[in-house]
Amino acid sequence: MFFKKITLIPFVMLINLYRYCISPFIPARCRYYPTCSEYALEALKTHGILKGLYLTTRRLLRCHPLSKRDYYDPVPCKNKKG
């Protein structure tokens, strides 16, 4: 668990750098709720690095001006096999 949290730090820092230093200077254009950066943070924390990056990449590829979608798109729940 500790190792998982440590490995997430660089990704969380990059996302926060974007959110607080870059995003305020560009127009808001995310077509989804939660925003793509919020989605990325939640995906990484919920699913870990590999699946979190996969989900984030898929989300970023869907979020563009030509997308016909404009809606609530939460991070999928983590499946617990039991």
Swiss-Prot record:
It is found in: Cell inner membrane. InterPro entries: Membr_insert_effic_factor_YidD. It comes from Francisella tularensis subsp. novicida (strain U112). It is a peripheral membrane protein. Pfam families: YidD (PF01809). GO terms for cellular component: plasma membrane. This is Putative membrane protein insertion efficiency factor. Belongs to the UPF0161 family. The lineage of its organism: Bacteria, Pseudomonadati, Pseudomonadota, Gammaproteobacteria, Thiotrichales. SMART domains: Haemolytic. Its main location: membrane. The keyword Cell membrane applies.
